[in-house]
Amino acid sequence: MGVQGFQEYMEKHCPSAVVPVELQKLARGSLVGGGRQRPPQSPLRLLVDAENCLHRLYGGFYTDWVSGGQWNHMLGYLGALAKACYAGNIQLFVFFNGALEKGRLHEWVKRQGNERQTAQQIVSHIQNKGTPPPKVWFLPPICMAHCIRLALLRFHIKVAQSIEDHHQEVITFCRENGFHGLVAYDSDYALCNIPYYFSAHALKLSRNGKSLTTSQYLMHEVAKQLDLNPNRFPIFAALLGNHILPDEDLAAFHWSLLGPEHPLASLKVRAHQLVLPPCDVVIKAVADYVRNIQDTNDLDAIAKDVFQHSQSRTDDKVSRFKKAIAYYRATNKPLSCPPAHYLGRPNPGGIHSMVPPYPSPQMLNIPQGSVQSRPMTGGKCVSEQNNYSNIPHEGKHTPLYERSSPINPAQSGSPNHVDSNYFPPSSASSSSENEDGNGGSANHVSGNKPTWDKGKKSEKANKKDSTEQAKAEVPSPSGSGNKGTDKKANQPGHMQIPCLLSMPTRNHMDITTPPLPQVAPEVLRVAEHRHKKGLMYPYIFHVLTKGEMKIPVTIEDEINKDLPPAAILYRPVRQYVYGVLFSLAESRKKAERLAFRKNRMPPEFYVPDYPVIIKEWAAYKGKSPQTPELVEALAFREWTCPNLKKLWLGKAVEDKNRRMRAFLACMRSDTPAMLNPANVPTHLMVLCCVLRYMVQWPGIRILRRQELDAFLAQAISPKLYEPDQLQELKIDNLDPRGIQLSALFMSGVDMAFLANDACGQPIPWEHCCPWMYFDGKLLQAKLNKATREKASLIDLCDGQVELATKVEKMRQSILEGLHFSRQNHPLPFPPPPAMPFYPAAMYPRPCGPMPPPQGRGRGFPGVQPMPSQGGKLEIAGTVVGQWAGTRRGRGRGPFPLQVVSVGGANRGRPRGVISTPIIRTFGRGGRYYGRGFKNQGPPQAKPPYATSAEEVAKELKTQSEDSKSSAVSSDGSLAENGLASEEAPASQMNGGSGEARASSNSESALSSDSKLCNTNPHLNALNADSVRHKEQPLEGAVANKEE
């Protein structure tokens, strides 16, 4: 556990250092005098690290968290907490973790593995016993951090988000803004010089809402029991093992401290596996070692003694050891500029009190100024100009374009650069983190941002060791920071086989990706400002600057194949969001227009120089979190989404409509009924969009009819707003499928938050909150009633006819334009060999009204007839499916041969990647295949193209003749809700089977030309940068109209 085990060590082995306190008494002790007539001084200001306190802010470990979250119960708890703090003269400031923290990626990988195992234990427990799991298996419901953040904003509790290094920013923010104490639960905070450190896990609010208690850690007592000077805590923390120098690299040193005669020495190497000593034993041994160090400034001598048993990568370990010490010393440095707006409590002489680093127990009831304070000199320090304070209390939704960024471009080196005086540089341990030092990922070329280098120079001038911390790299194929170390390790003298205690410990690998497109400085300034204020989805800023995103673990049964993983289910949403963030549609349209004018290549065959690739870190079935997935950004094909600057900052009515249309298009819900308040109320729009998206998923049944009704019935139930009655509601037997459906739904809500913020917040955040439409426990009760008792819709609505009518209207709006029919007979012929590598269309282009098919098809028995306006999907001259056509006049030409795929007939798809051209380019063994290119060379950056338009026309003519003779068609049908045959394998989850089809007959919600955004990820993935359908004159006229 390394340094992270120090927190538990204090509680178990230093009982005198853990003192229970009541925060209201501490607040009363900070008042001036004791008379009632005197006004109180400034309130007791506490900074709360939300990452360690989410379960307490959620309301505790009550048993119904597994059902997807009881958000009204959480809202009531936070309301009581806010009321108690206001009555007790306590001011809370909650700091959320919004940093990507590539330097702690290996810790995140371990945590994801543990949570994934916990999720399987939860599912197994529910399947076997049907009861809620024990609280030790608490797994935060999806979207819990965002919901807590929005609830705190509702109760006017200030919030903020970190942006680079969460721990350092929390410590710096706590000191520079005059907080009396920190409420957290992390060893990094315990080992830094924080005067008042309270336990987040012990934070409790009494039932009457009048007493708020917790525990305080007295670090001077801890130092006394360890017999260690607090000034040596940085070396102590570095030798325990941390995110810079993990305890696996220090295993040989820890075992050497114990000695061969120690009772645990026999466990040093067991079964050829690395075994670490117990944490409490290591802490005592390292404390004894640090106590006996003669000169704590001679780091070279200390490192030489520590790594004398190391057999490989010694120089790298020494470098990391020095960076770890610099990291913890930076957290213990005193304030360079005290906060001008905060004054400590003056003593009778008028002099502001100074607090020692570790207060004595006599100071518990009356906390003095917690930081060293001096009277104001009339000016503000640099740290105050760019901090998280002065957040307006926004009781109602304020449009994004009205929330201008206070950051002055002239003061900041770059709109995307964070002031180095405020944000200490984060130490990275992953390969290629902060390699370029420009605020973006080292894996992206960022030469188009010259102002970032300017800010970096000022950072180097202010802090000498910042450059060393910012270049802390992990050996990897893509990183270049450790070339010298790797070269030295590969010399003949270092070619011996290392022992287990000196093997490399990084269990993740980064991948180099193409450079990100340039983003407007105004957009970056707004994104940074809103990110730090906690007003935006945290990963939007990191996608814009670093091109990376993390996806949390959800409760899903990895053995059962009935439901897809949430990361795969909502990946198309994220792909379209990435396209919106980087203004992909407008950029591509301009490039196509330019290429067409220069007569270089027809627009149908235009391919950009490089695609926009986002790295997604996720862990689910068949995917390890150790490597990222390369996901390509997609653009809407049927309409040109405006650029991000106009989408965010535009004030015209048309801009507002475009925001809403972009959001609906990302959620595949661009239908007129979604904007009809009579059918879909505003506060239920997110609910209906997520349910419609789940219904459209091809290949695997996600929502049945009765399950859809259960979701809608609980959303309009009066019991939703009665958390006390829901607590008394008893559920006899939990259903594992219901638990997984709740997790999938909340994952969809999380993606809806992402899409809404990325599109400029067309839906006010007050109407996005899940307590307006979801309660996990109520949903499980409705699901049991609908599936087990076979209750009718009127019974699900508790006999209220008006509620049943609302459910009917919402269901019709959700299913508008979606036509599903059941397959009666199997396909007459098996799919062609190329099918697994050419995913068929599962989300066809929407079209105008179309009557349901009747009678028998003309081709084969049991196959639904093709509509008169329909078309065929032909790949490599073979018909692999039929799909609903568009308006009259659109051509039905087949896909050109430049559609590419991966591998050969005997090659599988690269592990952990999706079916996009760029992933096939960067994936292992990826090759492009096309007619006329039999002798294919190594993987290319682009698919091959015909040399002339004549050859293309000749190829298309040949394919059209071949397609008429090859009559292999799909069934054109779906099971009950977009399902193919239930026996379909899980490998066909993404639509590779070609057996599921859905037709849409809806119009666009905000467009009169009936042009709906394409909802087919595979068509976009295969053709976004290669080829497109040839457009007829009518289509060209519409395109000219848009231009």
UniProtKB/Swiss-Prot annotation:
Keyword Cell membrane: yes
Disordered: region residues: 353-497, 929-1043
GO CC terms in record: cytoplasm; plasma membrane
Ranges annotated as biased composition (Basic and acidic residues): 451-471, 951-964
InterPro entries, per the entry: Coact_PPARg, PIN-like_dom_sf
Residue ranges the record marks as coiled coil: none
Localisation per UniProt entry: Cytoplasm; Cell membrane
Chain spans, region RNA binding: 801-1043
Biased composition (Low complexity): 995-1010
Keywords of the record: Cell membrane, Cytoplasm, Membrane, RNA-binding
Superkingdom per UniProt: Eukaryota
Membrane topology: Peripheral membrane protein
Gene Ontology MF terms in the entry: RNA binding
Compositional bias (Polar residues): 362-375, 405-419
Similarity remark: Belongs to the constitutive coactivator of PPAR-gamma family.
Role noted for this protein: May bee involved in the oxidative stress-induced survival signaling. Binds RNA. May participate in mRNA transport in the cytoplasm.
Name of the protein in its database record: Constitutive coactivator of PPAR-gamma-like protein 1 homolog
